[in-house]
Regions:
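Non-catalytic terminal segments and appended small domains
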Residues: 1-171
Length: 171
């Protein structure tokens, strides 16, 4: 089995006197919930706050770890299904990580309530890292594209005709 390499990252914190203090990483190695889980659970070490352009509170979930994604693969930081029990939503919906990125794994969540938000804590996974193969293709401008059954049908226009018949599969 190929290895996916992770590194702990120290971080700096501004003190009240304006100086910076280097803090040792408490980052946890991501883990699979089960042997067949597609994603690796990510845990936060700390949460910082930002305000977006619309004035909404954004929570930044830091992991204090970096990953070395092998060439030919891409990483996706995806929301956990438990997001439906929280009053936050990942800002980008999904984070895309190229194999050349070596910075901290983190995700930003927009608070969706004016009340005190229900959030993830440091003892529970807040997202999952999914690694999949990725073809690096050269963009080329052409005069025509090949024909397909769907053609130019847009959002929601490519729905197959409903046939709710259940067919028995014989082995």
């Amino acid at each position: 089995m190929e290895q996916l390499k992770f590194k702990k990252l120290d971080y700096s914190v501004k003190k009240e006197d304006g100086t910076e203090e280097i803090k040792k990483s408490e980052g946890k190695l991501p883990i699979r919930a089960t042997s067949s889980s597609a994603g690796l659970d990510l845990y936060t070490t700390r949460i910082t706050q930002e305000v977006d352009n619309s004035g909404k509170l954004v929570l930044v979930y830091h992991t204090d770890i970096a990953v070395e994604i092998p060439e030919g693969y891409v990483g996706f930081i995806c929301m956990k299904p438990s997001i439906s029990k929280r009053s936050i939503i990942m800002c980008n919906g999904i984070e895309v990580i190229g194999s050349d990125y070596r910075g901290e794994l983190m995700a930003k969540f927009k608070v969706t309530t004016d009340a005190i938000p229900t959030v993830y804590t440091t003892d529970e996974p807040f997202a999952q890292l999914v690694i999949v193969p990725c073809s690096i293709l050269e963009p080329t401008l052409v005069e025509e594209l090949s024909e397909t059954e769907r053609g130019e049908k847009g959002f929601g226009e490519a729905t197959a005709e409903q046939n709710n018949e259940i067919k028995e599969v014989k082995e």
